[in-house]
Amino acid sequence: MKPPPRLQSLIEEGLIDTVVRQLMSGKEAMVFVVRCGDETRCAKIYKEATHRSFRQAVDYTENRKVKNSRSARAMAKGSKFGRQEQEAAWQSAEVDALYRLAAAGVRVPTPYNFCDGVLLMELVTDAHGDAAPRLNDVAFTPEQALAHHATLVAEVVRMLCAGVVHGDLSEFNILLAHTPGADGEEGVDGPVIIDLPQAVDAAGNNHAQRMLLRDVANLRDFFGQFAPALLRTDYGPEIWSLYQAGLLGNDTPLTGRFARAHADVDMQAVLREIDDARAEDAARRLRMAMAAG
């Protein structure tokens, strides 16, 4: 196919040989399947802020570190240069998170290069070598749902131990990839976490707890459709409580149960949570409608 203008410079620089096809167009980026030598990869082109439906909400960008003091001042003032720097920081956040999580052992797409607002990374595939489906497009047996849920809860823990909260984790941004078996053994399917530009620093962001609880609840609600027993679990508060106490490790046993302490109710906080939940539900319904269309 004819390369989109944003990929032409990467072709000229020899980072991409050919563009095969468009894979998807989402709320924050367009993704293309490309050939790089003998390998097939994907190129993620980030949309400009004016063309994105996902806002750079202050909840996500709070306390993100900016190395250049001039850039930090410009971003604080909201100048044209500051907005450009803020956009660049938003895009590079996913690259930073991918490298950080890969180093921590979290299954994410392997990043290869980031140039001119384009991220070159691994094309995650299924057993036939085609682009892997999102969880939202797959039906599971109860046993599969329990297994994949356990894997993803462990990945959330691993991410948190690395200091990262995804912030928008759901069935829409997790792929079901196939890993070939060794020496003729049968391969296995497993989840791969994608879409990380909104990932937040667990220790530096005041909204990290709420985001982690929402991420874990999304996993419970999705897999609970196939394994209803999961709907009675409460992993999110348990994970965060252990993290706050300094007791959370990659191999920390979890029960899925959490006893909440009774305290005076902060009605303003409750109302804020209700408003947030309504907004998240509206966004979730929009994503489902877009996926169905």
Predicted regions and their residues:
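Amphipathic alpha-helical transducer elements in NTP-driven molecular machines
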Residues: 88-95, 149, 209, 213-216
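Regulatory N- and C-terminal appendages and interdomain linkers associated
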Residues: 1-25, 143, 147, 151, ...
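Activation of the activation-loop gatekeeper triad in protein kinase-fold domains
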Residues: 124, 194-200
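Short, low-complexity Ser/Thr-rich regulatory SLiMs
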Residues: 35, 176-180
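Catalytic-loop of the protein kinase fold
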Residues: 161-171, 176
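AlphaC helix of the protein kinase catalytic domain
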Residues: 129-141
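Short beta-alpha connecting loops at secondary-structure transitions
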Residues: 200-207
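Conserved ATP-binding subdomain of kinase catalytic cores across diverse folds
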Residues: 1-131, 161
